[in-house]
């Protein structure tokens, strides 16, 4: 993983974040007008559930999947959505992409995919939360693969 600052006026990184080495973290107090962003790595993926712009991603998650997600590390976003951090145990290559369902996936850089990042809305350093990220079940893997393995869901 790695973390860096986002300029809130432009909603863009303050650095070329793709050039940061893995396990490089922003240290110190986040200045006014900025937010912390975190990019996952390895098999860690982040399911970004949106509740904004007329979309409610929660309405597109089966109850059994949501029941599994609540046991991994997660936090609410400012728009009342959430970021669920998952250790993906499947065999497929998931894509860093958004869908029309209010569900986005952020992955680390892999196989030509630059990866992505999320605004980190938690008050504890991500390094201290890694142990809370749970492995995915076969059922969750299949659901993620249906949404994020290259089928056009935009």
Give, region by region, the residue ranges found by the protein language model.
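Conserved phosphate/metal-binding and DNA-contacting active-site motifs used
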Residues: 1-154
């Amino acid at each position: 993983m790695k973390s860096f600052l986002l300029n809130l006026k432009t909603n863009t990184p303050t650095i070329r974040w793709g050039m940061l080495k893995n396990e490089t973290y922003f240290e110190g107090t986040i200045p006014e007008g900025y937010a912390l962003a975190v990019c996952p790595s390895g098999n860690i993926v982040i399911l970004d559930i949106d509740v904004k712009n007329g979309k409610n991603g929660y309405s597109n998650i089966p109850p059994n999947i949501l029941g599994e997600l609540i046991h991994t590390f997660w936090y609410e976003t400012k728009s009342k959505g959430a970021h669920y951090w998952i250790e993906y145990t499947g065999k497929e290559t998931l894509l860093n992409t958004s869908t029309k369902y209010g569900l986005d996936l952020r992955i680390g850089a892999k196989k030509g995919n630059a990866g992505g990042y999320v605004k980190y809305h938690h008050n504890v350093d991500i390094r201290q939360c890694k142990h809370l990220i749970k492995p995915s079940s076969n059922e969750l893997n299949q659901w993620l693969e249906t949404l994020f393995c290259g089928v056009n869901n935009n």
